[in-house]
A protein has these predicted regions:
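Hydrophobic alpha-helical transmembrane segments
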Residues: 1-9, 31-34, 75-88
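Membrane-interfacial segments
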Residues: 38-46, 77, 81, 146, ...
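Alpha-helical transmembrane segments of integral membrane proteins
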Residues: 15, 19, 50, 54, ...
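Terminal transmembrane helical anchor/hairpin motif
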Residues: 83-153
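Secretory targeting signals
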Residues: 18-71
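A structural motif at transmembrane helix-loop-helix junctions in multipass membrane proteins
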Residues: 58-93
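Helix-loop-helix units of permease transmembrane domains in multi-pass membrane transporters
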Residues: 1-23
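Alpha-helical membrane-inserting segments
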Residues: 30, 34, 38, 69, ...
Length: 153
């Protein structure tokens, strides 16, 4: 029904990207609330609510960078979707699970989530977060440009 109206593919995909951004933010915030609630339920004396929420939301630039890779891959064509899925899987394997699988540091550094600390209360490197946001914006722009040039039929 939506595609029967005069909606451009770029605006439709940008709406999906905005939805992904809001959803990722909510999931990260709810994960932080869950951590605080779980710690309070067992009587733990951990970091404060603000520290946990900042730690959770600090992962947002890396998450958006991975989502932007998927967006750009789709913009270039449906055959490129495998590149987007590879980015998601490699980010998971090399980011949070990189030390567990014994990946070398140079390889783990290719995953966006390795550049932001997952530890609650750790200082957030603003330079890395800013660079990831710039990369995500550049990938969104590239994906939108590619989608405009693409024949969707």
């Amino acid at each position: 029904m939506l595609l029967a109206t005069a909606v451009s593919p770029v605006s439709r995909l940008l709406a999906a990207a905005a939805t992904a951004t809001v959803t990722a933010t909510l999931v990260l915030l709810l994960a932080g609330v869950g951590l605080v609630t779980g710690a309070a339920a067992v009587g733990g004396d951990g970091p404060g609510v603000v520290d946990v929420l900042v730690g959770a939301v600090s992962q947002l630039p890396a998450t958006l960078a991975v989502a932007a890779i998927v967006y750009a891959a789709y913009g270039f064509g449906s055959r490129w979707i495998a590149v987007g899925w590879a980015a998601v899987v490699l980010d998971l394997l090399l980011g949070p699970l990189g030390t567990l699988i014994g990946a070398p540091q140079w390889l783990r550094d290719t995953a966006p989530h390795t550049h932001l600390p997952a530890d609650v209360g750790a200082p957030v490197p603003l330079t890395a977060a800013f660079i990831l946001i710039v990369v995500a914006t550049a990938l969104l722009t590239t994906g939108s440009w590619a989608l405009r040039r693409r024949d969707l039929v």
